[in-house]
Swiss-Prot record:
<comment type="similarity">
    <text>Belongs to the bacterial ribosomal protein bL32 family.</text>
</comment>
<dbReference type="InterPro" id="IPR011332">
    <property type="entry name" value="Ribosomal_zn-bd"/>
</dbReference>
<dbReference type="GO" id="GO:0006412">
    <property type="term" value="P:translation"/>
</dbReference>
<dbReference type="GO" id="GO:0003735">
    <property type="term" value="F:structural constituent of ribosome"/>
</dbReference>
<dbReference type="InterPro" id="IPR002677">
    <property type="entry name" value="Ribosomal_bL32"/>
</dbReference>
<dbReference type="GO" id="GO:0015934">
    <property type="term" value="C:large ribosomal subunit"/>
</dbReference>
<dbReference type="InterPro" id="IPR044958">
    <property type="entry name" value="Ribosomal_bL32_plant/cyanobact"/>
</dbReference>
<keyword id="KW-0687">Ribonucleoprotein</keyword>
<protein>
    <recommendedName>
        <fullName>Large ribosomal subunit protein bL32</fullName>
    </recommendedName>
</protein>
<feature type="region of interest" description="Disordered">
    <location>
        <begin position="1"/>
        <end position="22"/>
    </location>
</feature>
<dbReference type="Pfam" id="PF01783">
    <property type="entry name" value="Ribosomal_L32p"/>
</dbReference>
<keyword id="KW-0689">Ribosomal protein</keyword>
Amino acid sequence: MAVPKKKTSKSKRDKRRATWRHKAVVEAQKALSLGKSILTGRSTFVYPTAEEEEEES
């Protein structure tokens, strides 16, 4: 069974967690921004919306 040779330092652990959390924050901001633009109708959205799907059928 694979076992780490040495304990990871707290600073390295914290740095990795900070990177991971920052990526999550950036993705959350993008999602919120996209949601706001869709609600205001200012978006040029790539995926078809429910209204467009109904018109095509």
